[in-house]
Amino acid sequence: SGVWKHHKVVPETPAGFTMRGTVPTDENGVDVMMEIWEKGSSEPPHSHPGDDMTVVIEGKMSVQFFKKDGEKLVEDGKPLILNKGDAGYIEGGRIHDAKYLEDCKLVYVHDKQFGFDAAAVSA
């Protein structure tokens, strides 16, 4: 399908990641991205300013949630495993990582303008 073409590499993002997004961003709307992740790629613990929803079109991924315990992060429950056809929801500000267990195609919807905050999770 043509919808999965024209993905681009975005500077300062994890290896194995390409995306296609909506432009321009409506500050009161949603950002929608079509993401492709290679098997074995991952995202470090981070959070987003708004709620997000990921729909797995192809592949399998794992999301681990974390909470702060003083100066360090500790796992918050078991990893959430998302397979083809599954959708996952993450509240804004919730710390999580992501691991791509298979090649993945995702539709990612973020409330308001997308943001990635790794600084908020570190001391």
Task: Pin down the residues of each PLM region.
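Tight coil/turn sites that cap or link beta-strands
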Residues: 38-40, 84-85, 91-93, 103
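Short, conserved beta-strand element in jelly-roll/cupin
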Residues: 36-38, 48-69
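A short, N-terminal "cap"/entry segment at the start of jelly-roll beta-barrel domains
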Residues: 1-34, 44, 79-80, 123
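Short beta-strand His + acidic residue motifs that chelate non-heme Fe in jelly-roll/DSBH
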Residues: 43-45, 63-64, 90, 95-101, ...
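Conserved hydrophobic/aromatic beta-strand scaffold that supports enzyme active sites
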Residues: 32-36, 53, 79, 87-89
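Short acidic-glycine-tyrosine-enriched beta hairpin
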Residues: 68-92
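Double-stranded beta-helix
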Residues: 4-7, 27-30, 95-123
